[in-house]
Amino acid sequence: MEEACLIRRLFTDLKRVTDLQKPDKIYLDNSNLLYVLCPQRPEIGTVREAFFANQLASAGHTVEYAGYKKGDFRIDSGPVIEVGGADKGFSQLEGQEHSFVAADDIESASMRKIPLWAFGFLY
């Protein structure tokens, strides 16, 4: 299903992944599919995370699951990104070097907070 671009599997450490290993997270590859497949409105956090993972992976970046309480994603084994709404803070990213928040419902970047829509230009 991943080769058909229906799902995206995320692992915590890609260096240790085996064929039989269970992924840490599974997202639909295209966030628009969530609106088609959910009988009610999909969880907005899942939509944001699916969109973010899709945009960066489509641009050729390696997207890993950052781990519990460490942010949402690790990009190219480097920066950690937490995805959330406009009020999302940096508490989950404490102690993480090169960490950023990709925030929905904001128009422009400030400090380490980047608008989620800006990642759409990577596609």
Model-derived regions: residue spans:
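Active-site flanking residues adjacent to catalytic metal/cofactor-binding acidic residues
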Residues: 29, 81, 103
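Hydrophobic beta-strand segments of well-ordered beta-sheets in folded domains
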Residues: 77-80, 97-101
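A structural signal for short secondary-structure junctions
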Residues: 20, 56, 74-75, 93-95
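Active-site-adjacent loop/helix micro-motif of nuclease/hydrolase catalytic cores
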Residues: 44-47, 86-95, 109-111
